[in-house]
């Protein structure tokens, strides 16, 4: 249905909507994780390719990487790729480029401040992820 309705919008308007969504989505997604760039500063970085004074380089990379990751997800959807471990690792690598080593399972324990949940250690996480994808495939094939 989305693609049907999308076809009724002229290409310039559609492109404008998509560009606005990409910018707003990137800003909001990185802001919720603590990024201090404003929406206007995010626009300057992403659309004008300019850095913003007084901001950490990490924050610049976060918004640039988020935009790349969003486009990667759109590409995977357009190519009708199934969500799998490879795609998730690719996304992690894109999101963390120039920040930390990404696309691999962590080897050290982590904590979530203020949360009662303790994330699994590296090896346990690997097993849980494998089980998740097996369960996902099973649910897709079963009638629920």
Regions found by a protein language model. Give the residues of each.
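FIC/Doc superfamily catalytic core
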Residues: 1-144
């Amino acid at each position: 249905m989305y693609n049907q309705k999308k076809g009724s919008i002229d290409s310039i308007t559609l492109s404008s909507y998509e560009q606005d969504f990409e910018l707003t989505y990137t800003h909001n997604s990185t802001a919720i994780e603590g990024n201090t760039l404003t929406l206007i500063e995010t626009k300057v970085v992403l659309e004008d390719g300019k850095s913003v004074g007084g901001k950490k380089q990490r924050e610049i990379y976060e918004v640039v990487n988020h935009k790349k990751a969003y486009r990667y997800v759109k590409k995977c959807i357009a190519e009708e790729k199934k969500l799998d471990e490879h795609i998730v690792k690719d996304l992690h690598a894109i999101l963390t480029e120039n920040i930390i080593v990404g696309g691999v399972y962590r080897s050290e324990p982590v904590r979530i401040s203020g949360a009662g949940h303790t994330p699994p250690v590296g090896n346990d996480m690997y097993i849980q992820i494998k089980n998740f994808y097996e369960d996902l495939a099973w649910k897709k094939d079963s009638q629920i």
